[in-house]
Amino acid sequence: MKKIITLLLVALIAVTACFSFAGCSKEEDESYKFGKELLRYDSQLDTLAKLAASDIDVSIIDSVMAGYYAKTGDYANQIAIVDDLILAQEKYGIAGRKNDKAFVSKINEALIALADSEYETIGSAYGLEESLCLENDTVNPLASADDNSWNEIVSSGKIVIGYTIFAPICYDIVDEVPTKGFDIELAKAVVAYLNAKYNVNLQVEFLLIDWDNKEVDLAQKNIDLIWNGLTITEERAANMCISVPYLNNNQVAVVLKSNLSKYSDAAKILVNMNSAIIGVEKGSAGESVVLK
C-alpha cells in the first residue's frame, strides 16, 4: 500500500505541477515534474550543505546517502527524509567502457563469488543490509566475453576507479585517497579476489572525478571503472558496459526537520513540492527524476 501511495503521489505531482524553472522556455518547462526552481550542484553532499543553509527547500538524492547523513555527521540534527515519498526505485552498477566486456565479466565474477562473504560483511559494516541485492546464484551475463580488455588491465598492473565523496559509499579522504566507504572496501575485496584467483598483481587506484564528466573520463581512459553508486539506466547501459546490479537504491526528498510538517501528508507534499526550490547533483539520477 505504501508503494502504491508513493507512486500515485509522484504521478499527481507530475500532472499538476506549476512549472516555472528559471531560464527555461515554456516548451522546456513542460519536461519538468515539480518545483518552482531547479539548482544543480557538483555533488549530492553540496545539495545537503545548501539545504542546511536554507538556500534550497528540497534536496533530491540517493536514499543510500540520505539515510547515512540523516543519522550521522554535521547535518543529522537538521535534515530529514520525507516519509513514504519514493521518487524512483533503482539499482547501482559498476561501469566500464562499452567494449570492455571481458574486464567487466571479471568484476561480475568476483562480486558473485563474494556475495555470501565479504559483500555481506562490508554491507553490514555500513548499515546497508536492506540495500544488498547480490546472491551467489546471480548469473554473469558476460561470462563468455573474450575480448582483450582483461588482458590489457592485467598488463597495466592497476585498476583506476573514478569516485566522488558520497558517504557511506566513499568518504574520509586522506591525501586524495578515500579511506572509508562501502564501494571502497568492496572494490578492494574484488581486486584481492581477482589477484588470488588469476595469480595477478593488480593495484587499485582511486581518482576523484567530476560526476557530470564521468562518461568522458571513462571513454578517454582517465579511469577504468565508474564505481561510485552509479544508477543503472537504459541510456547508460547502451553506452557503457555495466556490471550486475550490486545495491538497491531509491531517489528520495530530503528537507529541513523544521519544515518536515509541510510534507506530512499527500496533499501538503503536492503543494509544497511544487512551490519548492529543488537542489540536485549535476548528471545524477536525482536530476533525471526532476527532469523527466
Residue ranges and their predicted role:
Residues 1-9:
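Positively charged n-region of N-terminal signal peptides that target proteins for export
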Residues 17-29:
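Sec-dependent signal peptide cleavage junction
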Residues 26, 86-141, 184, 188-193, ...:
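Extended ligand-binding regions for polar small-molecule ligands
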Residues 27, 31, 70-89, 98, ...:
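Acidic, polar ligand-binding/catalytic clefts
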Residues 27-29, 37-44, 49-53, 62, ...:
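Extracytoplasmic small-molecule ligand-binding "clamshell" domains
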Residues 30-31, 156-165, 180, 267-288:
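Short loop->beta-strand "edge-of-pocket" segments that line small-molecule binding or catalytic clefts
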Residues 45-53, 64-68, 101, 105-113, ...:
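Solvent-exposed, polar/charged alpha-helical surfaces in well-ordered, non-transmembrane soluble domains
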Residues 55, 60-63, 70-74, 111-118, ...:
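Sec/Tat-exported extracytoplasmic proteins
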